[in-house]
A protein has these predicted regions:
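Internal alpha-helical transmembrane segments
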Residues: 1-47
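Transmembrane alpha-helical segments and their cytosolic interface motifs
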Residues: 1-12, 119-145
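Residue-level signature of catalytic and energy-coupling elements of molecular machines
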Residues: 3, 42, 81, 91-94, ...
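Membrane-water interface of transmembrane alpha-helices in multipass transporters/channels
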Residues: 21-30, 153-159, 213
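Alpha-helical transmembrane segments in multi-pass membrane proteins
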Residues: 27, 31, 35, 39, ...
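Cytosol/matrix-facing amphipathic helices and coiled-coil assembly/linker segments
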Residues: 48-132
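Juxtamembrane boundary at the C-terminal end of a transmembrane helix
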Residues: 202-213
Length: 213
């Protein structure tokens, strides 16, 4: 939501600064929302899919090693348990027992040796992409809405107020994970967002004056 809000807030303010019509600002905002949301969702899909394919390949290689070099994998299992503080004799005995079941040995090796959690492979790349699209769109629509219903400086003022409020809520929500002060985090988010929008608005003004001149 934060990426969508900041990027589209900056975009519509830049276009508004160039003295574009209400329709022009709204069109730019809609284009920014769709382009950004699609880009984010595609990036998320590629990221999740690539990670899953990488993990699956590593798991296949580990199974090949179990089939072709069981003694070497048995030693690796023993070393894993010894690293956890288990005595050597007991670690070797545990490794021997585990190697009787290659499926179990494979699960333990990919988790302990490769750090792969098989549960992560069950996640849907498409679900992640849709979730990313929705989050971006929710943030991006906040600065866009005023230009769909209002005109002139009224639209700009309402856009700034609505966006600042949204930025504060996002900053405050982040404190649930960081433990930071709600007011500090919220106002910091507002400050950065307003600064970005002010810069693009100023650039838009300069471009508008230059074109008009």
């Amino acid at each position: 939501g934060n990426d969508g809000l900041v990027s589209n807030f900056s975009l519509v303010m830049g276009v508004a600064g160039a003295s574009a019509s209400q329709a022009g600002v709204a069109l730019a905002g809609i284009a920014g929302l769709l382009a950004g949301a699609l880009s984010m969702s595609l990036g998320e899909w590629i990221s999740v899919k690539s990670s899953q394919e990488l993990y699956e390949n590593q798991m296949e290689l580990e199974m090949d090693e179990l089939e072709n070099n069981p003694e070497g994998e048995k030693r690796e299992l023993a070393l894993i348990y010894m690293a956890k503080g288990i005595p050597e004799a007991q670690a070797k005995e545990m490794a021997n027992e585990i190697m009787q079941d290659k499926t179990l040995a494979h699960q333990i090796l990919i988790k302990e040796e490769l750090g792969i959690n098989p549960e992560e492979l069950h996640g849907s790349a498409m679900e992640a992409a849709v979730y990313s699209f929705i989050l971006f769109a929710i943030g991006a629509i906040i600065p866009l809405l005023p230009f769909l219903f209002l005109t002139g400086y009224t639209a700009i003022i309402v856009c700034v107020i609505a966006s600042a409020f949204g930025l504060f809520l996002i900053g405050a929500a982040i404190t649930l994970f960081t433990g930071k002060n709600i007011w500090y985090s919220g106002f910091r988010q507002v400050l950065f967002g307003l600064a970005a929008a002010a810069i693009t608005f100023g650039i838009g003004k300069l471009i508008g004056v230059s074109i008009a001149g």
